[in-house]
Amino acid sequence: MTSRKAVALHAAYLIVLALTGAFLLLLVAFQHALAAATESITVKWKSPVSDTVCLAMSAGGQYCGIVDKEGAVQIYGPDGKLLWRQIVKGATDVLIARNGQSVLVYSKLNPVYQEVCFFRRDGRRLWTHKVDGCVWSGAVSADGMRAAVTTGERYIYVYKPDPNRPKYRRWRLEGIGYSVLFTPDNKRVVAATWQKSRLACYDLDGKFQWRSECEPDRQYELHASADSRSILGVIPGTQYKPGAELRFWDSGGKLCWRQTLDGFDAHALVSPRSQYVAVSYASYISKKGEGIIERKVAVYQSDGRLLWEKGGLFFGPRLMALSPTGASVIVSDGEHSIYNLDRRGKILSKLDMAGGIRKAVSSEDGRRILLHCGDGWLYLMGVGQ
């Protein structure tokens, strides 16, 4: 009797073990399927375009825009439909506010066209304003209520492009405004100045808030996190003057960390919740007496610690987007393919485009990517949708 009970208990144990194993296998398979669906890259819409000099997306990624080599500005709606097309002489850059409610167009570093043009969502021109000096940089606030440009005469202009009564304020910076942005809470404007290199923050009326000093002649491209808690500065570096650099400030202008990269062509993004910074860059390595370009992508935590780095001679990643949680990084190989990498640098998904990838810009949450490819098409990509 005792022997029979032992056999029965052993059989029951084996059955439970088998069921548990089957359940775990199903759970793993489900998680893999869920991850594949969450991290997949798909084409949302596409539209034929000519050669572009600028790509832009609104906050939230609902509206997209381009400027082509002829100065034609084209704005697209959420479904990819062309909403309007306007020729703006000398245009090189377009910026779009959330929901497409205002569009800012200007010609960068052009002494002939020192004008800023504002359009409504329907393409009607609201206002054209001549500024003092060449335009160096521009920004639109996330709520669409303000726009800003900096000029070579060290001015910053902050506009309120109201269709009935447009107005602006301007004040002088302590150097040329190389890059400018609005904080995502729409309450402040931050400029990175050249020559007298520093970050300077003001309220929308021009009242000084704080400054952070930098070494002379630094030119930082600025990015703000969507939670308004941090600001990322990037020096891309060039082949002739390598030495790319990252700087990470808190919302009060305190420098939290900096990272010098032995390379050039750096592009970096900060995650919406400020936990991660991703960067791709190129560097020269010597192989058999020849200089060869090697590319890498790296992800850092908010305290500056390196999480992972991937790349090399046989895989040259270019950063395209960073997911909201920092769980994945989307890169291209500089040719036809797009990859989604997880926190360990493992490939989650891949998509091959019909033409070589020429330009790319992402939404602030990393869920949409606008591409111009060599096949003559403009693509809006969705990540995990």
Q: What does each of the following model-derived ranges do?
A:
Residues 46-50, 85-89, 129-132, 170-174, ...:
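Surface loop/turn motifs at the tips and blade-to-blade linkers of beta-strand repeat domains
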Residues 51-56, 90-96, 134-139, 176-181, ...:
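Repeated scaffold domains used in trafficking and secretory/extracellular systems
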Residues 109-113, 194-195, 238-243, 288-293, ...:
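Short, solvent-exposed loop/turn segments at conserved positions within beta-propeller repeat blades
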Residues 354-385:
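Blade-level signature of beta-propeller repeat domains, shared across WD40, Kelch, NHL, RCC1
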